[in-house]
Amino acid sequence: MAEETISAVITALGEGAVGIVRISGEHALAVGERLFKAASGKALGAYPANTMVYGHVYDLDGSLVDEVLAVFMRSPRSYTAEDVVEIQCHGGLQSLKKILALTYAAGARPAEAGEFTKRAFLNGRIDLTQAEAVMDIIRSRSEASLKLAARQQQGQLARELRGLRSALVDVVVNLEAVIDYPEEDIEDVTYARVQQSVSDCCIAIDKLLAHAHTGKILREGLRTAIVGKPNVGKSSLLNALLKEDRAIVSQYAGTTRDVIEEQLLLDGVPLVLADTAGIRSTDDFVEKIGVEKSRQLLQDAELVICVVDGSKGLTTEDEAILAAASGKPCVIIVNKSDLGLAVDLDALRERFGKDKVMTLSAKTLTGVEDFSAWLKNYVYGSEGTLSDGAYVQNARQERLLREARQSLQEAGEAAANMLPYDCIEIDVRNAIDLLGEITGDTVQDEIINEIFSRFCIGK
């Protein structure tokens, strides 16, 4: 338990019905009792833990500050696993600021960003994946991302990782036995068995990595660029997806001169959608800037939607844009299907893949549902929905998993080549440490500090 007692407002600042001040640490009860007086006249600590108590907060001069409810949560049955007092007051900014200031006067210090959750981690109530899931819950963009974050907060990923670590620890124990007692005939240790154990763990890691793409999209949104030459219906497509007239639509080419960026949920998939200026050669200075932005967005996007005018044949401008997008994850939208098709769909599908070329009318909305279905398959895979397995939450976890797999691959190769057992053990131990860094079992202090510094004050 940390020695210092900390406090912070844990609800959003601003006008609201209720605001909450949290006090956590060894002296949380003493701090709370200095400013809160129960209407019954009893001390807060005299009530059973986790009992909501009605009363008032008073200033140092005895004047009334607010009518409140207070609750004392005794360690370890609290968010931080420390003694915690929470005071629920009216949600006005001045009331919250005054009560918080009184906690400082009573001996608490301001909590740092993420310090409550950091203490929950350091006190062993949650692991690092669960701590990261707390912020994912707060920042959820969709029902699917909330469901995934809640699942991770319950420790699903950590359980799988600890299962892998346990299996690898068994490998190390057996290897050490052979190294220390070479004269013994230990049946559990053969090069073939080591290879099999390592291979099983690699398969499990590959399964987790296969979901990393989905987890990242649900957490951060899929950065998507709508590109094409002028007047193919990019802005009309944006408006159709948004179901509102967000972008100006005109029969004149070059109407969109800047990037229009919007966030939307399309069948539960969070998109960060950018409608770009039409890509073409132009002498117009302002339009030229927009075209350059479009080219850059095409390169930076995680998904490119290439729009072509299906009522006309492909031009050299279309071909140049399609070539630029061919090295990116992309889908080809053959727009204006309501006007008849002059584009060779078979040739496009042979070039880009049958499932990546689809017809659509941004005017009549025909084909929009097909695009939504394609997008769900792109994000979730063939299942088309969130599976029951564990998901990697962020780039840190993905990087460590890939490094752990690389170490295990090297261990497997060493076993296949019948290298000394201690060489194999080094690689397996490294994988164990890397997996432990994901859950926080082996992580360094500076990494912990960096992770929790990204949290908001009061969490």
Spell out what each predicted region is.
Residues 242, 277-278, 302, 309, ...:
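Short glycine-/small-residue-rich Rossmann-like dinucleotide-binding loops
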Residues 1-147, 151, 155, 331:
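A glycine-rich (often HGG/GG-containing) alpha/beta subdomain
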Residues 287-311:
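Inter-motif core of Ras-like GTPase G domains
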